[in-house]
Amino acid sequence: MTIKVGINGMGRIGRMVIRAIIESKNKNIEIKHINNRSNSEASCTLIKYDSVHGKFDADLDFDKNHLIINKNKITFSQESEIKNINWKKFNVDYVFECTGKFNSKEKLLSHIKNGARKVIVSAPVSYTHLTLPTILLV
């Protein structure tokens, strides 16, 4: 079964998620959609050239609505609000929330309402009545 993922936010962590998935060469994980505030051209450049990790060894290209990584066309959008991202339309099951902006249950539920089955959050999440542990996956 292929795990179909989307990435919201392409800061340091979002870009590292992309690199990790591509470099793993795991055929069971497929990036279906990326949402980032900057355009696809700038996002492509940021993935390709990293000041810490160096040049990404992948074939990267873009058009207005896609990032193309190793000939795989990934849909791309520039939405500021989760409520405007239709994960179901992009066939996404799991969303990596990497903006750091949406860190409460109320805000994150928009991903689920828009079609994602699960959300993996890269920043601590605040709940009004619960303290949740932060889990580091290495």
Language-model segment annotations:
Residues G14-R15:
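N-terminal Rossmann-fold NAD(P) dinucleotide-binding loop
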Residues Y94-S126:
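ADP-ribose/adenylate-binding Rossmann-like module
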Residues I31-I69:
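Glycine-rich phosphate-binding loop and adjoining beta1-alpha1-beta2 segment
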Residues G54-E106:
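A structured beta-alpha segment of the ubiquitous adenosine-cofactor-binding alpha/beta core
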Residues T128-T134:
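Conserved small/polar residues in nucleotide/adenosyl-binding loops
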Residues M10:
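Glycine-rich Rossmann-fold phosphate-binding loop(s) that bind the pyrophosphate
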Residues A20-N28:
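A short, Lys/Arg-enriched amphipathic alpha-helix followed by its capping loop at the start of a domain
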